[in-house]
Amino acid sequence: AVRAARKAGNVIAKHYETPDSVETSQKGSNDFVTNVDKAAEAIIIETIRKSYPQHTIITEESGEHEGTDQDVQWVIDPLDGTTNFIKRLPHFSVSIAVRIKGRTEVAVVYDPMRNELFTATRGQGAQLNGYRLRCSNARDLDGTILATGFPFKAKQHATTYMNILGKLFTECADFRRTGSAALDLAYVATGRVDGYFELSLKPWDFAAGELIAREAGAIVCDFTGGHNYMTTGNIVAGNPRVVKAMLANMREELSDALKR
């Protein structure tokens, strides 16, 4: 997993240096893909297939590549933060998670621009370039920095989202909105941000980051405190006290659509 992430990161970094080599197309509303996403994905798939030809691979750009072993799934976002990459804003990552019978067991998030490799193995903690990670120990929202992402693919939730944001803003110190969900969760794990919330994510956005945050002592849940986020894509993360305070503030602003 680490080898695949580093190889993909090298492809991405090379193209970042030569912007003329990047071709962009639109695949949906406010949703872009580049030849670099596809090249990074291809090298990840090739690396996995070499060692584990029988595993199933699920990727953002090309969907499911079935293997004979349905129990082991690799969930991959070859370039999380494509919009930043296109705009030449150096904040994006490669996200790789290995799920066995539906449980994430191994996770890698790699930031090729900073050469930061976040890794986690279930039950063995999370690391950044080999150093153990612990999430922030904030006791409540006072003074906290919260990360988030706007629902740019689900603008029907814009008003509700802005209400939640406004409510939390009166309690916390400030927000960060950086454009890569995988790195947001990795930053929860390192304590660079105290908490994180976002709605309408896809499994490959957070599959790896979720385990890394958990293994650093964070809890991850949906907007009602449940575990339905794999289906809804609505996610809240942080240490238990921060998450409890975030949920309490969000509760009053949730629309019915976001309570699922």
Residue map of PLM features:
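Active-site-adjacent structural elements in enzyme catalytic cores
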Residues: E46, K50, I58, H65-R134, ...
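Active-site neighborhoods of divalent-metal-dependent phosphate/nucleic-acid chemistry enzymes
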Residues: D194-P203
